[in-house]
Amino acid sequence: MRAVVQRVSCASLTVEGHSGAQIGPGLTVLLAIAPGDGSRDIDWMVRKLLGLRIFEDDSGKMNASVVDIRGALLIVSQFTLYGDTSRGNRPGFSASAPYETAHEIYNQFVDRLRSSSPLVVQTGVFGRDMQVSLTNDGPVTMILDTP
């Protein structure tokens, strides 16, 4: 499982031309599922996202989590994070889980995230064309890969 995590002051998305989810301060998470990802990966990523201290505390240090600031999360599926361009210029996506498997793991991930925290968790629509708008705060961007 791979996530590109961005600290945002706001984010929103449009799904096939229609307004979709939106959040205020928090995290936008672009999430890709790999073959073999399962419950252990979901648990690790949920713990990491909720505990990641990339927000400023009262002294201005990056020492607060999204939970500490009572932020929100926008989760967007993005299989292209596993794109392989090592052979030519057109990316291959064989490192991404098949659609049905990825969809199931993605839904489990979102459910686990929602049940693990009182924070607002918004999502895109899995497998659909989306336009994501965000204001990256900092900018702060992290790339997380499950072990």
From Swiss-Prot:
UniProt catalytic activity: glycyl-tRNA(Ala) + H2O = tRNA(Ala) + glycine + H(+); a D-aminoacyl-tRNA + H2O = a tRNA + a D-alpha-amino acid + H(+)
GO BP: any one term: D-amino acid catabolic process
InterPro entries registered for this protein in UniProt: Daa-tRNA_deacyls_DTD, DTD-like_sf
Localization terms from the record: Cytoplasm
GO cellular component: cytoplasm
Keyword tRNA-binding in annotation: yes
Primary residence: cytoplasm
Pfam families referenced in this protein's UniProt entry, alphabetically: Tyr_Deacylase
E.C. no: 3.1.1.96
UniProt key word Oxidoreductase: no
UniProtKB keywords: Cytoplasm, Hydrolase, RNA-binding, tRNA-binding
Motif extent (Gly-cisPro motif, important for rejection of L-amino acids): 138-139
Top-level enzyme category: hydrolase
Gene3D superfamilies: D-tyrosyl-tRNA(Tyr) deacylase
Domain of life: Bacteria
GO molecular function, one term: tRNA binding
Note on domains (UniProt): A Gly-cisPro motif from one monomer fits into the active site of the other monomer to allow specific chiral rejection of L-amino acids.
Subunit structure comment from the entry: Homodimer.
NCBIfam families reported for this sequence: D-aminoacyl-tRNA deacylase (TIGR00256)
Family to which the UniProt record says this protein belongs: Belongs to the DTD family.
Function: An aminoacyl-tRNA editing enzyme that deacylates mischarged D-aminoacyl-tRNAs. Also deacylates mischarged glycyl-tRNA(Ala), protecting cells against glycine mischarging by AlaRS. Acts via tRNA-based rather than protein-based catalysis; rejects L-amino acids rather than detecting D-amino acids in the active site. By recycling D-aminoacyl-tRNA to D-amino acids and free tRNA molecules, this enzyme counteracts the toxicity associated with the formation of D-aminoacyl-tRNA entities in vivo and helps enforce protein L-homochirality.
Name used for this protein in its record: D-aminoacyl-tRNA deacylase
Gene: dtd
